[in-house]
From Swiss-Prot:
Active site positions: C75 (proton donor), C219 (proton acceptor)
The organism of origin for this protein: Vibrio parahaemolyticus serotype O3:K6 (strain RIMD 2210633)
Compartments (UniProt record): Cytoplasm
Subunit and partners: Homodimer.
Record flagged with keyword Isomerase: yes
An annotated GO BP: lysine biosynthetic process via diaminopimelate
Annotated site residue numbers, Important for dimerization: F270
GO cellular component, one term: cytosol
Protein's recorded name: Diaminopimelate epimerase
Site (described: Could be important to modulate the pK values of the two catalytic cysteine residues): H161, E210
SUPFAM superfamilies assigned: Diaminopimelate epimerase-like
Record keywords: Amino-acid biosynthesis, Cytoplasm, Isomerase, Lysine biosynthesis
Gene Ontology MF, one: diaminopimelate epimerase activity
Length: 276
């Protein structure tokens, strides 16, 4: 099997992006794991696959696979790179691009300055739709992780997120708590774990331990989930700067029932081809 690919990143969250419209490529879980290896493969956090639309009302179908080969529902940083990729490769000349995903639809708007704004849809807080095991919907849940008691928010941005507020992200025990939360029994499909430091009402710092990928330089859907939880808990205003290890995103949300918007960069690194 021979195919072309692009390497891209959104704030250091890096991707291998493959056009599966003009190329016939099949990715097994084992192949994805081998390609994701940073020593013996291409190296990436996620594989992004561009497919022809499943829905006639959309332009493309967007699939995401983590480095462990598991397919996931959403990746916000990947969505921005997806939009740049389909324009760079001449698959569309639109500036507003509609895509379907495993969990729904998104609109990707390419800005004049090269940044991309993504309509991430309406944040979902109903426990059974996240999914999250809870008797009823709450703004804050008490959870045990190892020997720690955590006060967390839970939300789906098309994929599940748990968010806990910390005093300082630099000293947060992400290496220990991240894996414990990722595989916590209350999240039957596992979860992305966000550790949020509130700097001010319009600025947070964030680290994210991603389901199936570990801690990454940036997580777009994680930034969205953290801001949504922060606004719901009364900690943040409607427009928030999110500082991640890899850079900054801007998130805006007018509250429950409204769509949430994320704006940030998408960088093309190089093109390559593989035979495997």
């Amino acid at each position: 099997m021979h195919f072309h690919f692009s390497k891209m990143h959104g704030l250091g969250n890096d991707f291998m992006v493959v056009d599966c419209i003009t190329q016939n490529v099949f990715f097994s879980q084992d192949l994805i794991r081998r390609l994701a290896d940073r020593h013996t493969g291409v190296g990436f956090d996620q594989l992004l696959v561009v497919e022809a639309p499943y829905d006639p009302e959309t332009d493309f179908h967007y699939r995401i696979f983590n480095a462990d080969g598991s397919e996931v529902e959403q990746c916000g940083n990947g969505a921005r790179c997806f939009a740049r990729f389909v324009r760079l490769k001449g698959l569309t000349n639109k500036y507003s691009i509609s895509v379907s995903t495993k969990k729904g639809k998104m609109i990707l708007d390419v800005e004049d300055d090269g940044e991309v704004t993504v309509n991430m849809g309406v944040p979902e807080f109903e426990p059974n739709k996240i999914p999250f095991k809870a008797k009823q919907k709450e703004k804050t849940y008490i959870m045990r992780a190892g020997d720690k008691t955590l006060f967390c928010g839970a939300v789906s941005m098309g994929n599940p997120h748990v968010v806990t507020v910390v005093d300082d992200v630099d000293t947060a025990d992400v290496d220990t708590l991240g894996p414990l939360l990722e595989s916590h029994e209350r999240f039957p499909e596992r979860v992305n774990a966000g550790f949020m430091q509130v700097v001010s009402r319009d600025h947070i710092r964030l680290r994210v331990y991603e389901r199936g990928a570990g801690e990454t330089q940036a997580c777009g859907s994680g930034a969205c989930g953290a801001v949504a939880v922060g606004i719901l808990q009364g900690l943040l205003d409607e427009s928030v700067k999110v500082s991640l290890p890899g850079g900054e995103l801007h998130i805006s949300w007018q509250g429950p029932g409204k769509p949430l918007f994320m704006t940030g960069p998408a960088t093309h690194v190089f093109d390559g081809q593989l035979s495997c």
